[in-house]
Amino acid sequence: MKIDYKKIAEELIPIFEEAGQKSIDLYNKGLKIEIKEDGSPVSNGDLKVDEIISKKIMQLTPDIPIISEETVNIKEKNKNTVFWLIDPIDGTKEYISGKDEYTLNAALVVDKKPIIGLVGVPKKKQLFYSYAIGQSFIRQNGDDKKIDCKKKNNRNNIIAVSSMSKPPELIMKKLNEYNVSSISKVASSYKFCLIADGTFDIYAAKERANEWDYAAGHAVAQNAGAIIKTLDEKPFLYGKEDYKNPSLLIKRSENLYD
């Protein structure tokens, strides 16, 4: 199967912008919220964004299956080698509460690795996208800029990003191996993007969430030069039958100061 990754990613950019604006419009009108079987909230914003993104992806790649958080049957095992992962709104709680760090996510996985990744951050008017090694970008206010996470850094200024202000002991132990000086709390897959652009240096997490939560941000960060593995230094791969993520370690570079 011949896939033009660049063309597909670029054709999805206006769709992500449309879906992002729709998420804002629906929030402003007042969201309709339900509770899913797993106890997590879902809004009409999640569902509408899913519809907009999925429709365009089906047009672009009709033969490639889509696995979306909002439509997947978790009991069905994933046996695909090429597939899309969509998390229409990662950070639904942030979205519902009016915060600005929720994200729109889509990734194309090929042979266990995310190649294309798009992460929209509507309230910040940012869109991160990538389609190949060395080809990660941020679009802001209509302008596209290539991003690269490599930079010179003071050894005493290693900054971690986390979904918690106080990560658990296992994670702190790993962060201390890299002489982390401070931890900033950020929600959703936006964390991946802020490593991709060099804002933060490292992110570590225990086993959590599902593949659609990570894949798009993974592509953006890895294609910007980040090193992404499990906590025990194994490759971080996709296409697991149950969609569950292992532990995660993202580093801006091998030693974080050059």
Regions found by a protein language model. Name each.
Residues M1-I89, K173-E177:
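N-terminal subdomain of lithium-sensitive/metallo-dependent phosphomonoesterases centered on the IMPase/IPPase/PAP
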Residues I66-E70, D143, D232-K234:
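Short gly/ser/thr-rich secondary-structure transition/capping motifs
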